[in-house]
Amino acid sequence: IGPNGAGKTTAFNMLTGVYRPTDGGIRLDGQNLIGKKPHEICKLGVARTFQNIRLFSQLSVLDNVKTGLHNQITYSFAESMFHLGSYRKKEKQMDEKAMELLRVFNLDGVADYKAANLPYGKQRKLEIARALATNPKLLLLDEPAAGMNPNETEELMETIEIVRKRFG
């Protein structure tokens, strides 16, 4: 929380490996994050949303959340190509986990809709659900209410409180 131009997004970009600080260090649970790639930092437990919504607009709501779960995949490329081994079981588990998150955000009823077809406020909630799917230790919300009307903002605040209580 801070005024425009205070450097919030720049700080988020440094925390998530988009920018590299010129001096100092960034640690999470004693591990240095400097020099790590964004996907490596995500695996270490840092997730974020953006000022401008960045969803996969042509994917379903469910599939958008599942993209956040892919850092936890344990099956091989061959298993995924040919639906062998643990692929079906793991995909079913990902579907269940994604639906659980969608229920938290009251998006389970639109799981099969394209993300692009959701109202703006629901797209924001979907972006947060996808970030939570990575199972983060630290969740960074960059201007989460930007562009929302007062009703959407109030609903988002209530949802964030539910997330705080449920996911700590």
Regions found by a protein language model. Name each.
Residues I1-G168:
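Glycine-rich phosphate-binding loops of nucleotide-dependent enzymes
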